[in-house]
Amino acid sequence: MASSLMSNAATTMAAATTTAQANMVAPFNGLKSISAFPVTRKNNDITSVASNGGRVQCMQVWPPLGMKKFETLSYLPPLSEESLLKEVQYLLNNGWVPCLEFEPTHGFVYREHGNTPGYYDGRYWTMWKLPMFGCTDPSQVVAELEEAKKAYPEAFIRIIGFDNVRQVQCVSFIAYKPASYGA
């Protein structure tokens, strides 16, 4: 009996050793000689430099005076109601909670109380009511936007999409600019 236990243990040990040896990596043999790689000589004259061709002639710079831009979608023309409904539907399709915020005086980041970023530099807007948890219809959000426009006709109003699982703001865009802004 003792001999049969001994042979079973030896067989098990031998099987474990062979599988361990099969999984081992080959030993390191050193670096290969660099002369084995092909050598290319590059010509560093002006013709080998990357070029964007003639596109430089048609590029324009956004005029920085009197035409401030804000956030996502601000370089597009004002959104029609149909486009606005599609954007809000996108928020809802992604499972984000729509929320309206407004800023009565500045619709952009500004530094009034210092030269370093902080709370009072235009990043934090006033929330319009509460986030619209459970909202499934984009027209509900647009109705709230219209109500906010009536209450604050001279304010900038934006719609944000808030992910309540990750607890982050995923998207934000200006939905209304006051008529006095003129852009």
Curated annotation (Swiss-Prot):
It comes from the Eukaryota. The keyword Plastid applies. Keywords: Calvin cycle, Carbon dioxide fixation, Chloroplast, Photorespiration, Photosynthesis, Plastid, Transit peptide. Its main location: plastid. InterPro entries: RuBisCO_ssu (IPR024681), RuBisCO_ssu_dom (IPR000894), RuBisCO_ssu_N (IPR024680), RuBisCO_ssu_sf (IPR036385). GO terms for molecular function: ribulose-bisphosphate carboxylase activity. Induction: Expressed at intermediate levels. GO terms for cellular component: chloroplast. The basic functional RuBisCO is composed of a large chain homodimer in a 'head-to-tail' conformation. In form I RuBisCO this homodimer is arranged in a barrel-like tetramer with the small subunits forming a tetrameric 'cap' on each end of the 'barrel'. Belongs to the RuBisCO small chain family. RuBisCO catalyzes two reactions: the carboxylation of D-ribulose 1,5-bisphosphate, the primary event in carbon dioxide fixation, as well as the oxidative fragmentation of the pentose substrate. Both reactions occur simultaneously and in competition at the same active site. Although the small subunit is not catalytic it is essential for maximal activity. Heterohexadecamer of 8 large and 8 small subunits. This is Ribulose bisphosphate carboxylase small subunit, chloroplastic 4. It comes from Mesembryanthemum crystallinum.
